[in-house]
Amino acid sequence: MSAPWIIAAALGLLLLVLVVGAFLMLAMGRLHLDLGWGRSVHQLGPITIGIEAPRKLVFEIVAAPYLGRASGSDIDLLAGDERLAVAAHHTKVHFYTARTVEVIELDPPGRVGFRHITGPVPHAVEEFTLSDLDGETELRYEGEIGIDFFVLGRLAGRHWVRPQWERGVRRHLDSVKRGAEERAASQERRSRAGGRRDSAAG
């Protein structure tokens, strides 16, 4: 193989490595591009689940990481107060972890909103709403993501980003449901035990 072909092959390989590396950096949220070129918007959800726990308790579990009240979480609280927070989310996606930084609006006990700052996509808005249903809770999620680069962005959003995103949301909702129902059941057991003690003392 002649020298020009060797150089061309080396440059082609280098370009491929750079493209793959840039894609991974974007997917991991380490490289943020907000160009607005050919942006397509993709709806997320709605996803709704029923939780056998009071709305106030469910809201406490959803909001806890953004109030500095959850240990061992994959969420880093960067700043905030009782109504507004900035946090970094670390989400496992196959062989890598995606990092997203968002502004979180806390409106107890009925709403938690998210507005994207940096991460794998240039635009994302999400919302959890909590409705009281006779002492239980309906937790509803919906939102949208925007992805640039025309047809490539539309294909990536439809076949990769949105399915992965919604899969992560469903895992989170399942975790909230499990935690809320366990806490509600524990509180109910303690309440019954206290009632029995009061009856025995009387």
For each of these PLM feature ranges, what is it?
Residues 28-32, 101-102, 141, 148:
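Short, flexible segments with low predicted structural confidence
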Residues 38-39, 83, 110, 145, ...:
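General secondary-structure edge motif
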Residues 42, 50-52, 63-125, 138, ...:
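Glycine-rich portal/gate segments that line the openings of hydrophobic small-molecule binding cavities
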Residues 1-9, 196-202:
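Amphipathic, hydrophobic N-terminal targeting peptides for secretion and organelle import
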Residues 23, 59, 95, 114, ...:
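Phenylalanine-focused residue identity feature
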Residues 3-5, 116-171, 176-178, 187:
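Beta-strand/loop substructures that line and gate deep hydrophobic ligand-binding cavities in soluble
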Residues 3-83:
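Hydrophobic ligand-binding cavity/cleft-lining segments
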Residues 17-26, 88-93, 129-142:
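Phosphate-binding glycine-rich loops and adjacent basic patches that engage nucleotide phosphates
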